[in-house]
Structures are given as C-alpha cells and as structure tokens.
Design a protein with these regions (language model features):
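Glycine-biased, small-residue-rich flexible motifs in mid-sequence functional cores and linkers
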Residues: 7-172
Length: 172
C-alpha cells in the first residue's frame, strides 16, 4: 500500500486533532484511511513491560469493543501496544497504529511483520515523513495523537514515570 498525505484541511483529517496543543499539520498514512472516520476509536495502552495481567485484561476488554465496531488505537510499541493491536486483529476488529517515526523504519524491529499487516488491512499513521527514524522525543508527541484520535482511553498497566501516564494525563 502506498503512502497518503493528509493535510489538516482535508475531510479525512480527524477534527479532534485540531483541539490538541500543537496539532500535526500533516498526517502520513498507510492502509485503510476510512478508519479515521470510525465513530468510536478507543486507545488501548499500557506498559512496554506488559505482564500476563495486560494479556488477560485485553481478552476481556477488546472483544466487546470490537463487537460494538470500535477501532482500537495504540502505538505499536512493544508490550501492551502490541498486545492491543494483536487482540483487535484476533477478535476480528480494526486497529490504528500511531508511530513515533516515519514508515521506512519500524520500531521496535520485532513489530515489522505486524506493521506490514496493519498497513495492508488496518492503518498505520505518523506525523513524521517516511525517512524520519525513531527519536526519544517523538514518542511523547506520538502519545498526544493517540489521545487526540481516541474517544476513550483504556490503560492496563503503567510505570509511575512512563509514556502511558503522559497519555493518561493528556486525557484528563
């Protein structure tokens, strides 16, 4: 699938993102752009060091969300994000992965195959041009987009100083 560029003036651009401090002026997407128009998008996030608790929590939480046509939004990070994307797929739902880098580099590398699947059947989204690699400061910026796309936020586990809690604070 090719890369689409969505300007903030486009009908496809999620209007809730415009309410963010410093909204992205452009989004790069690969996959099913209509997922941006889904009426209910739910962020499912948690620790990169997710335990069996997150696995069990998503087994309980994601099926009813999928049954109600909710799109699962997460960040393709290792741990809870990966579990959320995989659970959405497993239960027949749709998912959006918001990246903290461009499409030419997938981080973590262990999620390259998952990212290819998402680009084909779901949606990858980034505010970064394709050639931009992952940088530490990109991930808090990514988190604001996860929050801005979502109508609700599900957190399974989080360390006291973590990107998950940054996203949660943005949601309050």
């Amino acid at each position: 699938a090719g890369i689409e560029v969505i300007m903030y003036t486009s009908d496809l651009y999620p209007k809730k993102l415009l309410q963010l401090f410093n909204p992205p002026s452009v989004l790069y997407i690969k996959g099913d752009s209509q997922l941006l128009k889904a009426p209910q998008k739910i962020a499912c996030i948690g620790s990169r060091e997710a335990t069996s608790y997150s696995v069990e929590a998503f087994k309980q939480i994601i099926p009813p969300l999928v049954e109600n046509q909710c799109v699962i939004v997460s960040g393709l990070a290792k741990g809870a994000d990966t579990l959320a994307h995989r659970a959405a797929i497993h239960y027949g739902g749709k998912t959006i992965a918001v990246l903290g880098h461009g499409f030419q580099t997938i981080y973590p590398k262990s999620n390259e195959i998952l990212a290819q699947h998402l680009a084909q059947y779901h949606l990858l989204l980034s505010e970064y041009p394709p050639h931009i690699g992952p940088k530490k400061h990109h991930f808090p910026m990514r988190n604001r987009i996860i929050r801005g796309l979502s109508d609700a936020l599900v957190v399974t586990e989080a360390a006291l100083r973590s990107g998950t809690l940054i996203t949660t604070e943005l949601a309050l």
